[in-house]
Design a protein with these regions (language model features):
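A residue-level marker of the well-folded mature domains of exported/periplasmic proteins
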Residues: 1-171
Length: 171
């Protein structure tokens, strides 16, 4: 993305908030102050970003939401993938890997991320008719890998008789 934009003559300023929504708000405020033409955002928490993104839009800055939508801000562009299909593929992989069935954990991303609902829907559809049973479900605020590990440990307190874990985390 960056190299393509630069190749087209755009000046690119990349900021990484590291899962910290307050930091992401500060970064967007910085871009507004710098009067950027376009802000591309992978929202950590769309609800929390609403005011600052609306401010950017009100000042004529184009807003592109990448992977996660920010509700009611009328983004100029929304780029995403088929999240339900992602969940379906994860579910199918577990069904194939565990044909005899058994207990599994479902460790999902952020509870404030609409994509998580879609991934879960696809995942649960893929499990229908299989012998797999979700015995523990957890959600990781801001998609933090550390929370995923915590949820696996909590799940193991419920039962250590598992055959698999679905973890909707990029780490």
């Amino acid at each position: 993305f960056v190299s393509t934009a630069q190749g087209l003559g755009a000046e690119v300023n990349v900021q990484v908030a590291g899962g910290d929504v307050d930091e992401q708000i500060s970064q967007i405020e910085y871009f507004i102050q710098k009067e950027m033409d376009v802000i591309v955002i992978i929202p950590i928490d769309g609800d929390a970003l609403y005011d600052v993104v609306k401010e950017a839009k009100d000042k004529g800055i184009k807003v592109v939401c990448y992977d996660r939508m920010i509700a009611n801000v009328d983004a100029d562009l929304y780029i995403t993938i088929d999240n339900e299909m992602v969940g379906t593929l994860m579910g199918e992989a577990l069904v194939e890997a565990c044909p005899d069935g058994g207990n599994i954990f479902a460790i999902n991303g952020s509870p404030t991320d609409k994509n998580v609902e879609e991934v879960e829907l696809g995942f649960r559809k893929a499990l229908k008719g299989s012998k797999l049973k979700i015995v523990y479900t957890g959600y990781c605020d801001n998609w933090l890998a550390e929370m995923a590990a915590t949820h696996v440990n909590k799940g193991l307190e419920v039962t250590d008789d598992i055959v698999g874990v679905m973890c909707g985390n990029d780490d």
